[in-house]
Regions:
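Short, low-complexity disordered leader/linker segments with a strong preference
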Residues: 1-38, 62
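Short, surface-exposed acidic
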Residues: 157-161, 268-279, 311-317
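Short, glycine-/small- and polar/acidic-enriched structural segments
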Residues: 27-156, 163, 183, 189, ...
Length: 323
C-alpha cells in the first residue's frame, strides 16, 4: 500500500490542471444523505467542483473542496471519502495501482485553450511556427494534448516551436505578458478567462479541445468522478441517487449562468464574475453508462499510445467502469 501511494503521489506532481491557485483547502460540511448513509464527496476547485454547486447547496452530501490532488488521492484510497472528482488519467493510475476505485462518469471534457495577444485566431501552421508556447501540466492531460496537436501539424518541439513548461498557470500568464506578443500560452479554464479579464489584450486564439477531437477521434477528457468499489457494493442505491442529483446539478449550472456563478463564488471556487464568463468554455458534463466506457476507453488508449506511464502502465479492465 505504501508503495502504491508513493507512486500515486509522484503522479500528482504533474497534475496541476485542476488546481486553480488557492493555497488552502476549504471544507464544506453538509448533512448526511439519508437512511444513516453519509456520502462523503471531495472535488478539486475548478470546473469539476463548479458542476457540483447545486448539490452543495442542497445539503444532502458531505462536501470538501481541495486546491491540489495530493490531498484527494490518499483520502479516496484510504476510505476517508467515498466519491472524488479527479483528473481522468489519474483515475486510471489509482485503479491500476490499487484496484479500489470505479469510474462513475466523465464530468469535464476539454478545458484547454491557446491564448495570446491580438484577436486573430490561429488558422495555420505558420501562426504557431517559430513561437514559444508557455504551458503548465507537464506529465498530464495538457502535455499529451499539446503533443498530439503539434505532431499532427508536423511541428517538432525544440525545432519548429519551443514549449516552455511552467509549474503554475500564473507563470504562463506572466511570461506571456512579458513576451510583447511574440509568444503563446496554453491555459485551462477558468484560468484563461481570469487572464483575459486581467489583461484585455489577451484572447483565446485556438480551441485545443476541438483540435484534439478532430485528430484523435475522441473528445479530450479532463476530469472524471470515481467512487470506492467497497462503497458502491455496500450502498449502490446512494450512488445511483448521487448520479441523479449530479446530473441535475450539471444541467442547472449549464442552464443558469448567473445563479450558478453566484453559488460558485459562495463556495469559494472562483469569483462569480469570472465564473459567468468562463462557464461556456468549461465543458462541464456528466457522461455515464456505455457512453462513459466508450469515450473514456478510447481516450485512455490515446494516452497509452503516447506514454503508458500516464495511465498506470496499462489499460484498465472492464470493472474500471460503472455501467
Amino acid at each position: 500500500m505504501k508503495k502504491a501511494l508513493t507512486i500515486l503521489l509522484v503522479m500528482l506532481l504533474a497534475v496541476s490542471l485542476f488546481a486553480q491557485g488557492a493555497k488552502e483547502s476549504s471544507g464544506i460540511t453538509k448533512s448526511p444523505f439519508s437512511d444513516d448513509v453519509e456520502v462523503r464527496v471531495v472535488a478539486l476547485k475548478g470546473p469539476t467542483a463548479m458542476g457540483m454547486v447545486k448539490m452543495m447547496d442542497e445539503g444532502k452530501y458531505t462536501f470538501s473542496l481541495e486546491s491540489a490532488p495530493d490531498a484527494v488521492v490518499p483520502a479516496i484510497v484510504k476510505g476517508e471519502v467515498d466519491i472524488a472528482a479527479i483528473p481522468a488519467n489519474l483515475a486510471s493510475v489509482i485503479y491500476n495501482n490499487t484496484g479500489k476505485v470505479e469510474v462513475l462518469g466523465i464530468n469535464t471534457l476539454g478545458v484547454l485553450y491557446i491564448c495570446g495577444f491580438g484577436d486573430s485566431a490561429i488558422t495555420s501552421v505558420d501562426d504557431i511556427k517559430g513561437k514559444t508556447i508557455y504551458a503548465s501540466g507537464k506529465g498530464s492531460t495538457p502535455q499529451y494534448a499539446l503533443e498530439t496537436i503539434l505532431n499532427s501539424l508536423g511541428l517538432v518541439d525544440g525545432k519548429d516551436v519551443y514549449v516552455e513548461w511552467k509549474s503554475e498557470h500564473a507563470e504562463c500568464v506572466a511570461a506571456l505578458a512579458s513576451s510583447n506578443g511574440s509568444a503563446l500560452a496554453m491555459l485551462p479554464q477558468p484560468f484563461a478567462t481570469t487572464a483575459m479579464m486581467q489583461n484585455k489584450d489577451i484572447h483565446i486564439l485556438y480551441d485545443m479541445n476541438d483540435a484534439f477531437e478532430a485528430i484523435a477521434g475522441t473528445p479530450l477528457v479532463t476530469g472524471v468522478v470515481v467512487a470506492r468499489k467497497d462503497f458502491i457494493k455496500e450502498h449502490e442505491s446512494a450512488v445511483k441517487a448521487f448520479l441523479e442529483d449530479y446530473k441535475a446539478s450539471v444541467e442547472f449550472v449549464n442552464s443558469n449562468t448567473k445563479e450558478a456563478s453566484e453559488l460558485i463564488e459562495k463556495y469559494g471556487i472562483i469569483k462569480a464574475a469570472v465564473a459567468a464568463k468562463a462557464l461556456p468554455y468549461c465543458n462541464i458534463t456528466l457522461i455515464t453508462g456505455n457512453e462513459l466506457e466508450k469515450t473514456l476507453s478510447v481516450y485512455l488508449e490515446a494516452l497509452y499510445a503516447q506514454n503508458p506511464k500516464s495511465i498506470g502502465q496499462k489499460l484498465p479492465a472492464a470493472d474500471f467502469y460503472y455501467l
